[in-house]
């Protein structure tokens, strides 16, 4: 039997969005997703796809690694 690894991803999306004075709706529109998707990412209920994570990072002028942090359990 193998060992099961779980991973929780924390992120800085809310902090970056708020420091840029953007609403969830504005960021969602820029990313081509729903406001609910942005809310779910910010609260950790949804881990974005790699293309969306890259798009968010580029939008804020930073790297995926600076925004998303994996906690391995």
Residue ranges and their predicted role:
Residues 18, 29, 58:
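Alpha-helical residues within the helix-turn-helix
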Residues 36, 46, 65:
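Key DNA-contact positions within bacterial/archaeal DNA-binding proteins
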Residues 51-66:
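DNA major-groove recognition helix of helix-turn-helix/homeodomain DNA-binding modules
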Residues 21-40:
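Short alpha-helical DNA-recognition segment
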Residues 1-19:
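A short, Lys/Arg-rich alpha-helix, primarily the initiator
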Residues 11, 21-22, 48-51:
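Residue-level signal for the short linker/turn that defines the boundary of a DNA-recognition helix
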């Amino acid at each position: 039997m193998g060992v099961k690894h779980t991973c929780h991803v924390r992120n800085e999306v809310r902090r970056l969005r708020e420091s840029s004075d953007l609403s969830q709706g504005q960021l969602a529109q820029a990313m081509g997703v729903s406001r609910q998707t942005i809310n779910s990412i910010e609260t950790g209920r949804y881990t974005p796809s790699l293309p969306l994570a890259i798009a968010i990072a580029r939008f804020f002028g930073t790297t995926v690694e600076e925004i998303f942090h994996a906690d391995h359990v």
